[in-house]
Amino acid sequence: MESTEKLTDTNAILAYLYETFPLCFIAEGETKPLKIGLFQDLAERLADDSKVSKTQLRVALRRYTSSWRYLKCVKAGAQRVNLDGEPCGELEQEHIDHAQAMLKESQDKAKAKRAALAPKPAAKKAPKKVAVPQRAKTERPAKPAPKAAAPVVNYVQAQLTDLTKKQRVNVKLGMTPVAGVITDINKEDIHVQLDSGLTIKVRAEHILL
């Protein structure tokens, strides 16, 4: 009997939730507010699944609900959903206000962090006027060549015709691309085994090269 490898990476657990509960956990685009007490439903539904633990589920759920994408969906008129995507009541104003406050605080922290990491311009000092006797011109040593900048990875969206079995690709899952290998291509469905061991089924527009 084969033992099931337990998922420990939060991104891999989120990918598993996107695949298992696609009407509740949205991988891309606008999300939906989750039902209050959803963690308990999730723990019960996955009680017999040895891939994930309650602790890791809680961490993944916290990551999902604290993302800017999720906090932006908590707004007036939005309906909470259960694991099957069924409406479970409209949001209360108190919860909307709390989500917007969290979003603003998170965005302000990110802005402050970017500002702190930005290079500060050196203060300009007024040059002192000093009489310097003229000297014969001497050759200046050549300036060293500037160091090459580190390469920047620019992903491009794959076309179905570009994809083959055993090809290494990156799958768009939320904010962070996850690396994996194509195991099968069935018409428009592409099966990808992630480096974490999880196999998911996606379309070509979700694959980056």
Curated annotation (Swiss-Prot):
Residues 105-148 are annotated as: Disordered. Coiled coil: none annotated. GO terms for biological process: post-transcriptional regulation of gene expression. It holds the Pfam family ProQ. It is found in: Cytoplasm. RNA chaperone with significant RNA binding, RNA strand exchange and RNA duplexing activities. This is RNA chaperone ProQ. It comes from Shewanella baltica (strain OS223). The gene is proQ.
